[in-house]
Design a protein with these regions (language model features):
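Noncatalytic, basic helical substrate-engagement surface that gates or grips nucleic-acid strands
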Residues: 2-134
Length: 139
């Protein structure tokens, strides 16, 4: 049975798409890499086709290392501090992905100071029916 709601951790899936397709495999006419755009849209199409949700929300990280979480766990995502939060080739692709989703009517939600999983958790009490959460995060 299909879930009524499909909630996606968009930031996590965007990183998976970026690292899953080598940079340079797909380029925009201006030469900019769009591997993450292509990979994300392919994943989204497959998820919607396979799961047939009645409603879809893509949550985003507006802060990948929230202060409230670091206060509790000082080492939270410290490895990313050394290598940087986002690869340079991915940065220009992020707004393209969110713009495409908005253009096709997919709700994209984020909250300042929070990660996508926090946004998803805040939606759950407001949702009736079955829910499926899709993320690449392991925490």
């Amino acid at each position: 049975m299909a879930a009524n709601w499909l909630l996606l951790d968009g930031s996590s899936l965007m990183f998976r798409a970026f690292f899953g397709i080598p940079v340079g495999t797909f380029k925009a006419p201006d030469g900019q890499p769009v591997n993450a755009v292509r990979g994300f849209l392919d994943m989204l199409a497959r998820l919607v086709s396979d799961r047939k949700p009645k409603a879809l929300v893509v949550a985003t990280d507006e802060d990948w290392r929230p202060a409230f979480r670091v206060k509790v766990i000082a080492s939270y995502k410290t490895a990313r501090l050394e290598r940087g939060a986002m690869p340079a080739e991915l940065q220009p692709q992020e707004p393209i992905i969110w713009a495409i989703l908005n253009a096709i009517g997919v709700e994209v939600m984020g909250a300042a100071g929070f990660e996508a999983e926090d946004v998803i958790a805040s939606l759950l009490p407001k949702i009736t029916g079955t829910v499926e959460i899709v993320t690449g995060d392991r925490d």
